[in-house]
Structure formats: structure tokens, C-alpha cells
């Protein structure tokens, strides 16, 4: 069972996501701010995926992503953003986010993105079990960053065409 962390300041939406994802078989923690997310990540040891809003009351989701990477937490990071914030999603992808999803969230698309990201992360964790040095972790982060940058370029291209 994958362990997810939802970071969403809209309490009703975050609770709905948490309930729905638990019904889909995920273990789910929820935070309403970057500070609360940092506490969860610091105390839980690890998660398999972070699903975060970009705009949060204390900081933004990109600052959480940066904190995670500085603290050697390489779990996939999916950004949730409003349609009007597509350029912020591009920036998130360039910063190392695994993916993004526009609000309002379509459940089937969200579930597919979560499954894709957690399956990829599980495979990379298994391959890293043999080699746990920092250099290996950095290699995976670099590979994830290249994938995210390709998605960001596709996103930028599609926004220019519309």
C-alpha cells in the first residue's frame, strides 16, 4: 500500500481527497500548510508521493518541494494548480515535480497520475536498495528531473498553441 501526503489548505477538498484515496487503498496523511507537511515528513520517515497545492497559507508548494530535495526526500511530487496557474505548473515541473494536475481535479486522471508516479518511485527505490549511497540517489533525482523537464516543455508548448 502506497503512503501519500496531501498538502491542501482547502479543508473540505483535502478531506474529500483523503477519504477517496483511502477507499482506493492508499494510506493518506493530510496537511493544510507547508509547515504541517514538513512536520509529517520529518516524523514519518518517508512517503511514496506528495500531492500538493501550489498556493498555501504559509509558503508555496515549490518551497516544500525544495525542502524535500534538500533533506534527501525524493518521493514524487505532484502539483495541483488552478487552470490560470499553468505557468506555475511549468515552473514546478522544472523544479523537479513529477507531474501536475489542474483543478478541478478529475478523479480518474488523478488516480492514473498517482499510480504512474508511485509505481516508478517503487521501482527506483527497489533498484536503490542495492546501492544506497548519496550519489545513487542523486542519479535518480537527475533522471526524474529530466522527465519532469520534458513534461514541462510539453506543457509550455501546449499553452503557446492555445
Residue positions per predicted region:
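Conserved acidic carboxylate
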Residues: 8
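Two-component/phosphorelay signaling modules centered on CheY-like receiver
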Residues: 11-29, 117
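Acidic, metal-coordinating helix/loop segments flanking the phosphotransfer/catalytic sites
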Residues: 30-49
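Acidic catalytic/metal-coordinating carboxylates
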Residues: 33, 60-63
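Active-site residues of response regulator receiver
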Residues: 53, 81
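Short amphipathic alpha-helix used as the core "switch/output" element in two-component signaling
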Residues: 62-73
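C-terminal output helix
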Residues: 85-87, 105-114
Amino acid at each position: 500500500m502506497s503512503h501519500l501526503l496531501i498538502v491542501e489548505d482547502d479543508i473540505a477538498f483535502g478531506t474529500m481527497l483523503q477519504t477517496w484515496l483511502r477507499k482506493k487503498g492508499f494510506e493518506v496523511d493530510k496537511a493544510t500548510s507547508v509547515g504541517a507537511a514538513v512536520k509529517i515528513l520529518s516524523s514519518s520517515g518517508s512517503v511514496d508521493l506528495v500531492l500538493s497545492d501550489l498556493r498555501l497559507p504559509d509558503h508555496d508548494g515549490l518551497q516544500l518541494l525544495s525542502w524535500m530535495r534538500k533533506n534527501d526526500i525524493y518521493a514524487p511530487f505532484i502539483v495541483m494548480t488552478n487552470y490560470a496557474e499553468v505557468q506555475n505548473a511549468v515552473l514546478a515541473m522544472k523544479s523537479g515535480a513529477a507531474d501536475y494536475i489542474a483543478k478541478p481535479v478529475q478523479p480518474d486522471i488523478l488516480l492514473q497520475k498517482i499510480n504512474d508516479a508511485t509505481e516508478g518511485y517503487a521501482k527506483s527505490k527497489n533498484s536503490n536498495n542495492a546501492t544506497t549511497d548519496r550519489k545513487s540517489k542523486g542519479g535518480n533525482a537527475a533522471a526524474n528531473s529530466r522527465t519532469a523537464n520534458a513534461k514541462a516543455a510539453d506543457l509550455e508548448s501546449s499553452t503557446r498553441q492555445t
